[in-house]
Amino acid sequence: MSSSEVDKVFTEEQEALVVKSWAVMKKNSAELGLKFFLKIFEIAPSAKNLFSYLKDSPIPLEQNPKLKPHAMTVFVMTCESAVQLRKAGKVTVRESNLKRLGAIHFKNGVVNEHFETRFALLETIKEAVPEMWSPEMKNAWGEAYDQLVAAIKSEMKPSST
């Protein structure tokens, strides 16, 4: 493992919990992605300013035509990354995508506080699969999220393109 990767191990049990819950959530990823982002904006209203199409828009967030597709993409990428974590031993977002994500977050002025979306993700998952939710599942998704954030942060620098 390189120094840019998180040294924590994602266990087989954690993987099973993430895979099982993602299998249930996947079919609703558009709605869940939107819920995730609405929770983020509830927790950190200033995060809306990071999105040019939300900044001065009079359209309610949940009706914004650009937010739902973006939210779904982010939610699916986050969950798919979590599912692959143990098998790959690291975050599996393609390196080019990781570099692009890092550069975009850097360019848009995303700071550490903006990554405090962990709670929003965990709450979204908890509400999506209440019958499966447990402290172990919370820890599994939390660990996967932490590793993805660490990978993105390691690429947060100006784009080389």
UniProtKB/Swiss-Prot annotation:
Signal peptide: none annotated. PROSITE patterns: GLOBIN, PLANT_GLOBIN. Keywords: Cytoplasm, Heme, Iron, Metal-binding, Nucleus, Oxidoreductase. CDD domains: class1_nsHb-like. Residues 9-157 form the Globin domain. Heme b binds at residues 52, 66, 70, 100, 105. Pfam families: Globin (PF00042). This is Anaerobic nitrite reductase GLB1. It comes from Trema tomentosum.
